[in-house]
């Protein structure tokens, strides 16, 4: 019999007086027995609960379970979605290509077609934080420093944080950074410049500013065929015009195949009943076919 059950059952019955005396006598003479119920030791004063994080780092990991468990896969998916958005936007004059070695590095080039920087071809690299999209905004660095108020004259880095002071996930995207990099060449902003000389010349001596811009555009064009600074199979490389290669590619881009009109009409056809004869505007002009009996 279970001792716990026998003890609880015995406690519910009233014992005879003689038995109580005998039992009390035994308790006096026999040594004390340990209680059948186990008790936990007392909790120390400085103890920390198990459910409470021991450090802020652990707290950040617990609040972001997706990064903690699926970090690399989540990052890869986010960057793939970002590149898909870039392709869908079809930014005019902007081309990018993710690196072969790291998805956190994208190679790009901007073609400026009019304005002060007309005929400019500026190659750049986008550096994406490894905790994207929860970190800072991506960095955009030109291969050669462009003479511009918002471009650092030494490093060639564009002041991206001016437009994205705080990067907000699901709201800010990399295509917006690329669009901003294109827009700065058409709309000049001189407030808090990274290149004070360019800002002062734009405000006080526009002719000298234009002269330096022309020199900067020519400098970038003279180095257009240089090998990339970063060795990567997917780096953007320019080569001189080769008719044997480029003529055929140009013809394919310029030649547009037009679909026949009847095929276009078929694509625009809506399935369903129609009571109008093709080629007529009179309603109920279509002959109704009778089903054979």
UniProtKB/Swiss-Prot annotation:
Residues 74-222 form the UBC core domain. InterPro entries: Ub_conjugating_enzyme (IPR050113), UBQ-conjugat_E2_core (IPR000608), UBQ-conjugating_enzyme/RWD (IPR016135). It is found in: Cytoplasm; Cell membrane. The keyword Cytoplasm applies. One of its GO terms (biological process) is early endosome to late endosome transport. Residues 1-64, 269-293 are annotated as: Disordered. Its main location: cytoplasm. It is a peripheral membrane protein. SMART domains: UBCc. It comes from the Eukaryota. One of its GO terms (molecular function) is ubiquitin conjugating enzyme activity. Keywords: Apoptosis, Cell membrane, Cytoplasm, Membrane, Protein transport, Transport. Coiled coil: none annotated. Residues 14-23 have a biased composition (Basic and acidic residues). GO terms for cellular component: FHF complex; nucleus; plasma membrane. Belongs to the ubiquitin-conjugating enzyme family. FTS subfamily. May function to promote vesicle trafficking and/or fusion. May also regulate apoptosis. This is AKT-interacting protein. The gene is AKTIP.
């Amino acid at each position: 019999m279970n001792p716990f059950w026998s003890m609880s059952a015995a406690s519910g019955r009233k014992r005879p007086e003689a038995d109580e005396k005998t039992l009390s006598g035994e308790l006096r003479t026999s040594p004390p027995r340990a209680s059948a119920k186990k008790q936990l030791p007392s909790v120390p004063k400085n103890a920390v609960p198990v459910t409470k994080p021991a450090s802020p780092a652990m707290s950040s990991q617990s609040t972001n379970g997706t990064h903690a468990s699926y970090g690399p896969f989540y990052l890869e998916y986010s960057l793939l979605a970002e590149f898909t958005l870039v392709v869908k936007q079809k930014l005019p004059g902007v081309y990018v290509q993710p690196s072969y070695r790291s998805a956190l590095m994208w190679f790009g080039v901007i073609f400026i077609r009019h304005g002060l920087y007309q005929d400019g071809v500026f190659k750049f690299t986008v550096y994406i934080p490894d905790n994207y999209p929860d970190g800072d905004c991506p960095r955009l660095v030109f291969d050669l420093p462009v003479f511009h108020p918002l471009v650092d004259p030494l490093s060639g880095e564009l002041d991206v944080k001016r437009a994205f002071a705080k990067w907000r996930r699901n709201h800010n995207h990399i295509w917006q950074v690329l669009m901003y990099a294109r827009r700065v060449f058409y709309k000049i902003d001189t407030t808090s410049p990274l290149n004070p000389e360019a800002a002062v010349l734009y405000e006080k001596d526009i002719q000298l500013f234009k002269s330096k811009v022309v020199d900067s555009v020519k400098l970038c064009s003279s180095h257009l065929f240089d090998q990339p600074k970063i060795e990567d199979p997917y780096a953007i490389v320019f080569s001189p015009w080769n008719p044997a290669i480029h003529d055929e590619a140009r013809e394919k881009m310029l030649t547009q195949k037009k679909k026949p009109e009847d095929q276009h009409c078929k694509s625009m056809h809506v399935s369903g009943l129609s009571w109008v004869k093709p080629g007529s505007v009179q309603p109920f002009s279509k002959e109704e076919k009778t089903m054979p009996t």
